[in-house]
């Protein structure tokens, strides 16, 4: 169990813009945000408002145009590419709308694969994968090929892969977007269970109001500004 209520992320005057064909496209200009260890945060807003961009900044998949992003007090915008990769491997789990599981491998092998590629002995990675699958209620499907799994089971397997190394934060981009309502509700509840049981910080980009309502914080990105709807 991770210690809660310590600051995990602090964004200070963060701006992000891209150069368009004729002019700069401003995604957001000055975001300030604190996320504590153990928080569960929904990020909502219209398409194109910058929700996924914010998630990418937290996960070191992109850099801000200005400002600082602190992780446990350390400025991750100043990290080298190697340091960012190490942070992602150790501290960050990602879940996306599409699971990107490989059909030629079974469920447990898919969950273990990233750790094996990173250098973990296969036996150790498979043991960790078995435990992760147990946490998401998928022990009985460990030896099954991915093609035999339902949509909800595949997303659960993707979540198991994301939590394999017990990261400090799970970043999920539309994790229920490709699922029917009932299955999406089940996956949403699983994410909240992991947040509570493991103390894992959860940041979810979603258009699903049912999923957003489960979180203890709801942030809206609108016209380049961030609004905390719990304030």
Swiss-Prot record:
A single MF term (Gene Ontology): ATP binding
SUPFAM superfamilies per UniProt: P-loop containing nucleoside triphosphate hydrolases
Enzyme class: translocase
First-listed, main subcellular location of the protein, grouped into a coarse class: membrane
Topology relative to the membrane: Peripheral membrane protein
Segment forming the signal sequence: none
Superkingdom of the organism of origin: Bacteria
Cellular compartments per GO CC: plasma membrane
Subcellular localization, as worded in the UniProt entry: Cell inner membrane
Pfam families to which the protein is assigned, alphabetical: ABC_tran
Enzyme Commission number(s): 7.6.2.-
Role of this protein: Part of the ABC transporter complex LolCDE involved in the translocation of mature outer membrane-directed lipoproteins, from the inner membrane to the periplasmic chaperone, LolA. Responsible for the formation of the LolA-lipoprotein complex in an ATP-dependent manner.
Protein name (database record): Lipoprotein-releasing system ATP-binding protein LolD
Organism: Oleidesulfovibrio alaskensis (strain ATCC BAA-1058 / DSM 17464 / G20) (Desulfovibrio alaskensis)
Gene name tied to this protein: lolD
């Amino acid at each position: 169990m991770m210690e809660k209520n310590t600051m995990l992320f602090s964004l200070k005057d963060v701006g992000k813009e891209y150069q368009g064909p004729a002019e700069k496209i401003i995604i957001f200009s000055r975001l300030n945000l604190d996320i504590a260890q153990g928080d569960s945060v929904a990020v909502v807003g219209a398409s194109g408002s910058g929700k996924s961009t914010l998630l990418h900044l937290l996960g070191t998949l992109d850099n801000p145009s200005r400002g600082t992003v602190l992780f446990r007090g350390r400025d991750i915008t100043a990290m080298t590419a190697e340091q960012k990769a190490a942070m992602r491997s150790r501290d960050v789990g990602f879940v996306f709308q599409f699971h990107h599981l490989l059909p030629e491998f079974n469920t447990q092998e898919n969950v273990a694969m990233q750790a094996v590629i990173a250098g973990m002995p296969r036996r150790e990675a498979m043991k960790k994968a078995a435990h992760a699958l147990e946490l998401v209620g998928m022990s009985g499907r460990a030896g099954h090929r991915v093609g035999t799994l339902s949509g909800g089971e595949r997303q659960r397997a993707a979540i198991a892969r994301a939590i394999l190394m017990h990261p400090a934060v799970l970043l999920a981009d539309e994790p229920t977007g490709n699922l029917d309502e009932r299955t999406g509700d089940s996956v949403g509840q699983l994410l909240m269970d992991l947040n509570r049981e493991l103390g894992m910080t959860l940041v979810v980009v979603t258009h699903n109001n049912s999923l957003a309502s489960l979180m203890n914080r709801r942030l809206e990105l609108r016209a380049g500004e961030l609004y905390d709807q719990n304030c």
